[in-house]
């Protein structure tokens, strides 16, 4: 690979796998001085004789990006921010490598949160996948998932006249808070309000990320605090751990209590990670609809699929910032939170949990988490893979073909329920309201959930499966299992094809849809996710029209086409 001006050249050894996946030997990567385009060095064999043009240069990731800025399409506005994201990602990688080593086999036997904080990759599709711009080094150690530092959330009281609380049917604000906070904590909060001459009954309680309070709200919302529309009540008592998605917390003091997802105004992987107060209004209704659909559908019940409902949400509406900013602006996403069900109460005796992203974890010695699970299970690798596909892929196929319902089913949004030996039993989907879409005008939705209906061109609908499942997850998992010698590529993709075929045979009434949205087509469009971030790392896609902003470049050979 030559730099834009031809003055540098990168060389490496790679094994090319399905879906144009390059498994690169990191030890083989070298950087060399090279004659600029159009200059004749007099060296015809590339050995650099006579001009020193083949001299080896030190490797530097920032230099690589700068030398390829034109080829990568990086604008003057995006480039420095992208360099900062790369630097932060490398810093995080260095932190992980400096930690005491835990091999993949040991991690595969560990508990849910040890796996969550011990894995190395959440989104390998993106190069700059751990930007977290806004954290200083102390905040990184306090709040990064891999730091595994216990966090106590800050609680605010928000004047009900300026805040919106919504909840699932049968759940109200007071019932939720009595379940989420100990009586002593609630009493302390109420006493603080009384000291200020205020009545807690006139306010909604809101959990806040500590970073958001100290770096954003305490200054940006100073007027709201001065007017006592917002009252800081201090830290809660429960300890939490940040999850791979960075702004969501798992309660380690009481694991059966809800996850808490908070607004966090840091730039991370293409977005400022706030939460929209406006979006929060419909969140419980969307989750109730999906939960009801899964409960009623025989196929989904048979797969064991569960969804973690976002049972309640609260958002604060700062009048000045809402008047001054457009819909979708980070200024409208500074103060909101939601409560999502914990997966712990779903477990049966002997079962354990692992975020699906962990299947892509490889330890510093090259050991694979997925391979370790397979060995631990005692199953033939092909049988382990079949069980995994039954729990993960089959529900996605059915939701797409029966309802034109799609998820964002990347590794951080799926939790696997494993048996005591590490074999997959069922899948749990999460991050519902912000990530799902219904592409059919005919699938009935309650009025309050209509925002998830999306207009998508017919020829792009099935791309959600090809891109999000095949290219963004199976490509990496297949590559890991293949290079680890666990399964060859043909066996992996044949198993995927068998899962698709098995589902299609079980649903002959959907035959016309299988033909219209053909998963066995010879090729499919390549949706380049990194190009989204390279084009605009502040707002990677328009959430109102996600399909309209895709970067489609060429096609990929479908790895299951030959198994039709």
Question: What residues fall within each predicted segment?
Answer:
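Nucleotide/phosphate-binding site architecture used for ATP/NTP-dependent chemistry
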Residues: 1-45, 50-390, 419-564
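Intrinsically disordered, low-complexity segments enriched in polar/charged residues with Gly/Pro
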Residues: 235-236, 402-404
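Conserved kinase catalytic-core helix
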Residues: 384-403
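Catalytic-loop of the protein kinase fold
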Residues: 406-408
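Canonical protein kinase catalytic loop motif
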Residues: 410-412
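Hydrophobic residue at the +6 position relative to the catalytic HRD Asp in the kinase catalytic loop
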Residues: 414-416
């Amino acid at each position: 690979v030559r730099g834009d001006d031809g003055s540098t050249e990168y060389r490496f050894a790679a094994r090319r796998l399905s879906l144009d996946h390059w498994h690169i030997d990191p030890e083989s990567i070298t950087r060399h001085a090279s004659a600029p385009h159009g200059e004749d060095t007099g060296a015809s064999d590339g050995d650099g004789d006579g001009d020193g043009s083949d001299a080896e240069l030190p490797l530097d990731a920032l230099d690589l990006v700068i030398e390829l800025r034109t080829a990568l399409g990086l604008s003057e506005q995006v480039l420095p921010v992208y360099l900062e994201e790369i630097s932060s990602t490398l810093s995080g990688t260095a932190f992980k490598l400096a930690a005491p080593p835990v091999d993949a086999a040991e991690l595969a036997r560990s508990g849910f949160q040890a796996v969550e904080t011990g894995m190395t990759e959440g989104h390998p599709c993106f190069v700059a996948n751990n930007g977290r711009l806004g954290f200083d080094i102390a905040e990184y150690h306090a709040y990064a998932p891999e730091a595994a530092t216990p966090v106590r959330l800050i609680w605010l009281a928000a004047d009900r006249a300026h805040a919106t609380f919504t909840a699932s049917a049968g759940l109200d604000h007071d019932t939720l808070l009595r379940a989420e906070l100990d009586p002593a904590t609630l009493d302390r909060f109420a006493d603080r309000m009384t000291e200020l001459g205020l009545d807690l009954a006139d306010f909604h309680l809101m959990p806040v990320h500590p970073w958001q309070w100290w770096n954003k709200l305490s200054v940006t919302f100073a007027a709201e605090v001065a007017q006592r529309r917002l009252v800081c009540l201090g830290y809660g008592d429960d300890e939490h751990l940040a999850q791979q998605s960075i702004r969501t917390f798992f309660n380690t003091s009481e694991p059966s209590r809800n996850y808490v997802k908070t607004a966090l105004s840091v730039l991370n992987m293409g977005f400022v990670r706030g939460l929209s107060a406006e979006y929060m209004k419909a969140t419980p209704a969307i989750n109730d609809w999906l939960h009801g659909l899964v409960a009623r559908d025989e196929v989904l019940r048979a797969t064991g699929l569960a969804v973690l409902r976002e049972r309640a949400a609260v958002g604060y509406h700062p009048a000045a910032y809402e008047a001054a900013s457009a819909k979708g602006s980070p200024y409208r996403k500074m103060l909101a939170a939601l409560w999502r069900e914990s997966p712990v109460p779903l477990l049966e005796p002997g079962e354990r949990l692992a975020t699906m992203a962990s299947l892509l974890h490889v330890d510093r010695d090259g050991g694979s988490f997925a391979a370790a699970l397979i060995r631990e299970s005692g199953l033939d690798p092909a049988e382990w893979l079949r069980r995994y596909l039954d729990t993960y892929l089959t529900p996605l196929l059915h939701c797409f073909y029966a309802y034109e319902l799609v998820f964002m089913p990347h590794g951080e949004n799926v939790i696997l329920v494993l048996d005591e030996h590490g074999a997959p039993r069922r899948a749990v989907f999460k991050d519902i309201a912000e990530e799902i879409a219904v592409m059919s005008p005919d699938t009935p939705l309650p009025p309050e959930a209509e925002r998830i209906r999306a207009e998508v061109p017919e020829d792009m609908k099935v791309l959600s499966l090809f891109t999000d499942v095949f290219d963004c997850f199976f490509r990496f998992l297949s590559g890991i299992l293949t290079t680890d010698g666990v399964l060859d590529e043909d066996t992996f993709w044949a198993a995927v094809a068998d899962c698709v075929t098995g589902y299609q045979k079980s649903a002959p009434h959907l035959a016309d849809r299988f033909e219209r949205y053909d998963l066995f087509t010879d090729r499919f469009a390549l949706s380049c996710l990194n190009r989204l971030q390279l084009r605009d790392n502040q707002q990677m896609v328009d959430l109102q029209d996600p399909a309209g902003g895709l970067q489609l470049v060429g096609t990929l050979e479908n790895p299951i086409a030959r198994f039709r």
